[in-house]
Amino acid sequence: MADLKPYIAKAASGEPLPLGDAKAAFDIMMSGQATPSQIGGFLMALRVRGETVPEIAGAVASMRSRMIPVIAPDDAMDIVGTGGDQSGSYNVSSCTAFVVAGAGVPVAKHGNRALSSRSGAADALAALGINIEADADTIGRSISEAGLGFMFAPMHHSAMRHVGPSRVELGTRTIFNLLGPLSNPASVKRQLVGIFAPQWLEPLAHVLKELGSETAWVVYGDGLDEMTTAGTTQVAALENGQIRTFEITPEEVGLRRCSPAELKGGEAAENAKALLGVLEGKDSAYRDIVLLNSGAALVVAGKAENLKDGIAQAVQSIDSGAALAVLQKVIAVSNDKPA
């Protein structure tokens, strides 16, 4: 039986693990050969010392080698936050996904239940009536027929069951928060990724480039793992093989600045109700932050020339009823009913 202890000792000593060692360590954890205490110790040793790009790449290689894939169009994208920002905000990326799909871009949305927050993507979507445990074929059909499919991480990364209890007990972000956006079961090449800390912007953009992404924006919104209308958003953009960094304020793209309190979410049922309100056209700070993120996603998808154009398309997606229609179709298809 393989032993995680040498890798724990190495990480705890402050020594970075080469990609091969990182993959080997994650292979041990993902195959059920490590105890919960060992997993927790290893994850926190990495976090305290600071995870490196080779360690993330090795962990992703281990996860990808075990995942159950989903077939999606070549131009599909993912819109995902790492979680772990401790903000308790609304499910911005989930709502954004429906708006982007309503604007004509296929979305293969990867997400999980809450691990370090009150309501994760899966919690809110399940509360809306989506069958989050649909199989890979049904999800592929949902993407092609409804424009969006939701991939519940534990269904596609079943090896994660070995580390899930340790993550919940730790109750804080770990390297696994970084891995979700990098381990999309549909192997999308375009991503809008929200990150929990600004020091990860450029490293994650480099990891995405190494993993074959064509276009991606990695964003940090002043305490949020999404673009924010309550402050300044920092962006590391992978475009045409190059990575550039810049900042965005809501005012410069014609949106209202709000207070962080206006973006506070609640439990899954409350967040689901708020998400539905946005798709039904209700005006709110939640709508504005969704418009900002949707505009950016449409730029990443190549559908919009710039952020203002993307926001205009997002407004049209909501106000025409297209985004709400996507939600209704996804609910139907995920529950094996005609769209």
UniProtKB/Swiss-Prot annotation:
InterPro entries: Anthranilate_Pribosyl_Tfrase, Glycosyl_Trfase_fam3, Glycosyl_Trfase_fam3_N_dom, Glycosyl_Trfase_fam3_N_dom_sf, Nuc_phospho_transferase. Pfam families: Glycos_trans_3N, Glycos_transf_3. Anthranilate 1 binds at G81, N112. Anthranilate 2 binds at R167. Binds 2 magnesium ions per monomer. Keywords: Amino-acid biosynthesis, Aromatic amino acid biosynthesis, Glycosyltransferase, Magnesium, Metal-binding, Transferase, Tryptophan biosynthesis. Its cofactor is Mg(2+). GO terms for biological process: L-tryptophan biosynthetic process. Mg(2+) 1 binds at S93, E226. It catalyses: N-(5-phospho-beta-D-ribosyl)anthranilate + diphosphate = 5-phospho-alpha-D-ribose 1-diphosphate + anthranilate. It comes from the Bacteria. One of its GO terms (cellular component) is cytosol. Mg(2+) 2 binds at D225, E226. GO terms for molecular function: anthranilate phosphoribosyltransferase activity; magnesium ion binding. Pathway: Amino-acid biosynthesis; L-tryptophan biosynthesis; L-tryptophan from chorismate: step 2/5. Catalyzes the transfer of the phosphoribosyl group of 5-phosphorylribose-1-pyrophosphate (PRPP) to anthranilate to yield N-(5'-phosphoribosyl)-anthranilate (PRA). HAMAP family: TrpD. Homodimer. PANTHER family: ANTHRANILATE PHOSPHORIBOSYLTRANSFERASE. This is Anthranilate phosphoribosyltransferase. It comes from Brucella ovis (strain ATCC 25840 / 63/290 / NCTC 10512). The lineage of its organism: Bacteria, Pseudomonadati, Pseudomonadota, Alphaproteobacteria, Hyphomicrobiales.
